[in-house]
Every structure is written in C-alpha cells, then in structure tokens.
A protein has these predicted regions:
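Long, amphipathic alpha-helical coupling/dimerization segments that relay conformational signals between
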Residues: 1-2, 14-20, 79-190
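Conserved alpha-helical segments that form or flank metal/cofactor-binding pockets of metalloenzymes
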Residues: 67-80
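A generic short alpha-helical patch detector that favors 3-5-residue windows
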Residues: 38, 66, 70, 86-89, ...
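N-terminal "first-domain core" detector
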Residues: 15-69
Length: 190
C-alpha cells in the first residue's frame, strides 16, 4: 500500500468509526461563523496555554519560530475543523500539515495537546449546544487520528529505510515490546 492509499484509508476509517456524516459537516460549517467571531480569543487562549509548556515553547525557541507561526498553525487547524469536508483531499491536507509539524520537531504528545487545548478553547468561547459539542469532538478525533497516522507512517518509513524493517515486522516488534513492558510494568513503575 502506498503512502496516499494508507493515509486515505485511515481518513475513511476514522470518518466511519467516529460517525461523521452530512449532519456533522453541516453542523461544523454552520458553527464556523461562531468560531470566526471568537477566533482571536480562541487562538490567543490556546497560544497562551501551549506556550506555558516549557517543552512546547522550547521547540519554538530552538527553531527560531515566532508566535505568529503558532498562531498560523492554530488558525489552520480551526479552518480544517470547521471548513473541511472530510474528503480525500482534506485527509491529504491534514497529512501535509502534520508532516510539516513533525519536520520542525513536534512529537505526537504535542499534536495531541494542540488538538485538545484548541477544542477546549473552542467550547469555552463559543458556548455550543450538545450537538455542536459532539461535532467538535468528532472533528477533533478525525484530525487527531489522521495526524497520528501521518506520524506513524513516518516512523515506519524510518524503520524501513534505516533498518530494512517492513510495516508488518514493525507492528510485530511494537506488539512484542508492549507485551514485555506490560508484563514488567509493576516493576518499572514501582
């Protein structure tokens, strides 16, 4: 399976699993005006939370990236959440955005924190009803699933290129390592 097929398969799988349908898309698109009217507050509060994290702030300082870059990332994610259509091209845009974030040094936990902090601020500043909250969570889940798939795709490529390990071998090693850690977790965490 090539890169595009793998990414698109995950996008479709995530949409189905999360129950994203036309109603979800309509709800998100209808909410975009609420989000846009609170955009500055949402982005500012999210930036403040993220930049309070020393690791996150350190990554930006190390790379000489300005706060405007963080703002751009958050605004791009907002656009993808509320104006995207969960199509194949939307899935590819999320993969490209994620590859760029990984390229500048964002580990998965930072991607997760970005999504949850941003979602929290969206809810805090837009006062959504329960159907809107559900749609926000669905969009967040879909974006995050596609971000993680992009990350794992890069990780598998690294193993394949540097060690000659196939995707199946990588997954087997992952499972075996998880089993070993699981068996020893009490000793490791004591």
């Amino acid at each position: 399976m090539n890169l595009r097929e793998k990414i698109l398969k995950n996008g479709l799988y995530s949409s189905l699993l999360l129950g994203i349908n036309n109603q979800t898309k309509t709800t998100l698109h209808d909410m975009s005006h609420m989000v846009n009217s609170s955009r500055d507050e949402i982005v500012h509060a999210s930036m403040y939370s993220l930049l309070q994290n020393s690791e996150f702030a350190g990554r930006f300082r190390e790379r000489g990236l300005e706060p405007g870059y963080v703002r751009g990332i958050l605004e791009n994610i907002l656009d993808e959440m509320f104006k995207g259509d969960f199509s194949e091209e939307h899935t590819v845009r999320i993969a490209r955005m994620t590859f760029d974030l990984i390229r500048i040094g964002f580990p998965p936990r930072m991607l997760i924190m970005i999504m949850f902090i941003l979602s929290q601020e969206i809810v805090r500043h837009t006062y959504p009803n329960s159907n809107q909250v559900k749609a926000i969570l669905q969009a967040c889940g879909w974006l995050l699933s596609n971000m993680m798939e992009s990350y794992f795709t890069i990780e598998e490529e690294v193993f394949a290129n540097s060690l000659g390990i196939t995707s199946a071998s990588y997954n087997r090693l992952l499972k075996l390592t998880a089993e070993k850690i699981y068996r020893n977790i009490d000793k490791e965490l004591a």
